[in-house]
Amino acid sequence: MPVTHERGYLIPAIDSDSVDYLRCAVQLARSIRRWHPDANITALTVKQCSDPVFDQVIPLPHGDLGGYRNDWQVFDASPYRQTIKLEADMIAAGPVDHWWTLFERRDVVVSLGARDFYDRPAESRYYRKIFDQNDLPDVYNAITYWRLSATAKEFFSLVRSIFEHWTVYKTLLKFSEESPSTDVVYAMAAKIMGPESVTLPQKLGPNIVHMKRHIIPTQSHDWTQELVWETDPFRINTVAQWGLVHYHVKDWTLHE
């Protein structure tokens, strides 16, 4: 993809059988624009979309390969010299443009760790057993930055290779997944390249508020039925949120 702008946010929005990720991407883009009206935002999707919240809507450059296996295409698809890729099912609960200053001297930054809605580091390892069992860095691809560079090209080439040759790579892991998640693939790529080359220290770099049951924690999967949430500002159980909130319940809408 030709470079059209220096910086911008790229939101992959490839629907699954059960999730309308383009709807999620629209909600995320609107939340970013609330704080940064002039931000450049691109959706990456196989669907038609004319929503003006996006500056560009572009297709997958190599076609729909199915689910997570599309992820490596973000490097080829981005129209930016510096890109922040964001998972679609999140909300920007506050300004995030300071990330550019934080990231700009690095070639690749994948976020480390997660927080609960009280802004405490996530302690539960329920969803991260494969990381602990294999000494993988605790990365979350939900926030990933790169600038056009040899390092970024190498990283996403590794991501592609791991997805395409998973039957080989999974033999390197204990208790490997039958189908790899993007976080596991990013973690393997980071470990091969050296985590310090593609991450920032957890206390320095941004990380998501993760609203999964065992992190929050709640009794059920659907936190929206147990916790009280408010808008303007976005608060959960009266606690004001900041940064990016990964709401996880895919059909949740901030503004009803």
Label each PLM-derived region with a short phrase.
Residues 49-51, 63-67, 116-118, 204-210:
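A short acidic, often aromatic-flanked loop/helix-cap motif at beta-alpha or helix-coil junctions
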Residues 5, 39, 80-82, 106, ...:
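Short coil/turn segments at beta-strand junctions that form active-site/ligand-binding loops
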Residues 49, 59, 69-121:
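GT-A fold catalytic core of metal-dependent nucleotide-sugar glycosyltransferases
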Residues 8-73, 227, 247, 251, ...:
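Glycine/proline-rich, flexible active-site/cofactor-binding loop segments
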Residues 42-45, 84-87, 92, 108-111, ...:
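A structural signal for short, well-ordered beta-strand segments and their strand-loop junctions
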Residues 15-18, 23-24, 43, 77, ...:
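Catalytic phosphate/metal-binding cores of nucleic-acid and nucleotide-processing enzymes, i.e., regions
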